[in-house]
From Swiss-Prot:
InterPro entries attached to this UniProt entry: UPF0145_dom_sf, UPF0145_YbjQ-like
Organism per entry: Saccharolobus islandicus (strain Y.G.57.14 / Yellowstone #1) (Sulfolobus islandicus)
Pfam families for this protein: YbjQ_1
Protein family according to the UniProt entry: Belongs to the UPF0145 family.
Name under which the protein is recorded: UPF0145 protein YG5714_0873
Length: 114
C-alpha cells in the first residue's frame, strides 16, 4: 500500500516487492486514544441485547486505526524513511470507556530495483 500524499510505502510484509531495503531506521509507533462516550456505550448495550454489529463502534475503530497509521507514517517521515515494513496494529482497553489503538512497524529507506 502506498500513501502518495505522504510519499511513504507501507506493508505488513517484511519486504516490498520491487524494492531493496537500504537502511533500517528503527521502530515507529502511532497511538490514538478514543473515548466511546456514554451514548455509544448505551447504544452498544441496547444492541448487544438483540445481537448484530455495532456500527458506531466499527466506524470509531476504523477511524482510530487510520489515525494511528497516519501518526506512525508521520514518525517515519521525521526519521527520513520512505517506507514502513512489518506494520502491526494493537488495541487495549484503558478503562470502560477508552480504548488505545497502536500502529507500529519498522521505518526503512528503500530503493527501487532496476
Amino acid at each position: 500500500m502506498s500513501y502518495p500524499e505522504a510519499n511513504v510505502l507501507v506493508t505488513t510484509a517484511e519486504t516490498i516487492p520491487g524494492y531493496t531495503i537500504v537502511e533500517v531506521l528503527g521502530i515507529v509507533v502511532g497511538i490514538t486514544v478514543r473515548s466511546r462516550g456514554l451514548g455509544g456505550n448505551l447504544m452498544a448495550a441496547l444492541r448487544s441485547l438483540v445481537g448484530g454489529e455495532i456500527k458506531e463502534f466499527v466506524e470509531m475503530a476504523e477511524q482510530a486505526r487510520m489515525q494511528a497509521l497516519i501518526r506512525m507514517i508521520d514518525r517515519a517521515k521525521e526519521l527520513g524513511a520512505n517506507a514502513v515494513v512489518n506494520i502491526r496494529f494493537d488495541s487495549n482497553e484503558l478503562n470502560q470507556s477508552m480504548d488505545e489503538i497502536i500502529a507500529y512497524g519498522t521505518a526503512v529507506k528503500v530503493a527501487k530495483n532496476s
